[in-house]
């Protein structure tokens, strides 16, 4: 019988003998002590992804009202060859804590992040903290922080790693989840991973992220000395306890400390909108603007952003690091945007702090849970007394999710084919340019294996949404669970709540008429016609698709169920007897 971590919690006994556990020759904990430590880690560490790393190293978990600097000793800086992970929510003070640590180290520092806007903001904060100066926005992009501090993007580091090879320094990897998040459209993550693995002895590393779930296995792999396969298998404690002991026995890591914080998302209210109904979304944002609310709008598709720009009017937009440098620097400097709305893509979804009490509406159009959390985190709130924020998320249909799976699986197919034969990358270059890069040192193409990891994570998440094809609002429910809320979708969560009420009213009136009728074929046809009108006029039923043909009784009953009517219509079968004439 396998013993799970749930069994450990309830002290359920196991039929496995002690002999199956392979412990280190000189373990830090004996078997019984390790079992108790597992219980302690489960109780104290809410993030499943972080538990294994907490088990094998040291860790501290702060409360939802603390800031990360309250639990980190600024002198507790990793030694050369070692690392630490700071995994805490957006707005918990990770940047401030890092700036304090930089002041306490004698090592040269390289700070990296993945977006120009986030880089400008770090420079502003560092200069303010170290020199007490407010730097003009137009200088942030080009300013230097001094001889011992270099602040660059991951993309810049990836192209200049030769400058730092063999040199001793402290490397601060902010927004480290980007190594997975960006791997599908860029090869820089693959280059960074290779640089880290090749230079572990001469650099100290601090990893920072607000979304550790997907990237934690990547960090564990980079920092692993031995037992990598067993460790990665045991990182999800839904596996049996034996595998955790095996992993503990063989896994050695350079990661010495994990800092994390509890989250409190009670200040966030989620609402759902139809991704194809731009007018409905724009009308809602306009109404909120009229009430004095600002909105941050994240879109995957620039063309949709342009449509929203035109409809909303009073709107800033940033779709590229290169074409809006002055505007990016100004937002980083002021920690707010000037217009009522800011429409953006991945340019501003990471690392940017927006301290603006009028920013109380966020729209996030994505199927990626990492991106979603990062965008929501741009609006900074007081951790002790947060203001209420409304977040609009798309109510993706099963068709939308299925299309996303098909697209990701097609990309995965190309990745695996190129992995087997890198020369195929030329064939796929137009469709998927981030598959490989040419390594001038080894003089052959290098496959972007991080893209494979990113796609595997994405596909697993999307497939999880389709476990029950009949389950409506699967993505929205997953988001609610991600934020520790009950996965219950109520009518008032929809932007089209008025249409839902209209649909239910029309369906109820049609059913009441039928209920009080003779219930013959003519009455049934009348009911079907009225239900079709209720569905087609409100676009609430069947993902808004129009009902054009004659509907069957099964569809009638499904519509009644959707309208909250607890009745079914069943055909009465008449039997005609035969007798002799």
Residue spans for each PLM region:
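The feature captures the C-terminal accessory region of ATP-dependent helicases
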Residues: 69, 78, 89, 101-102, ...
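Conserved helicase ATPase motor motifs in RecA-like P-loop NTPase domains
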Residues: 87-92, 177, 192-219
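Conserved Walker A/P-loop ATP-binding site and its immediately adjacent core
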Residues: 97, 105-128
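Conserved strand-helix element at the start of the C-terminal RecA-like helicase core
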Residues: 108-119, 284-310
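SF2 helicase catalytic motif II
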Residues: 165-195
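Conserved helicase ATPase core of P-loop NTP-dependent helicases/translocases
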Residues: 322-344
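Conserved SF2 helicase motif VI
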Residues: 368-389
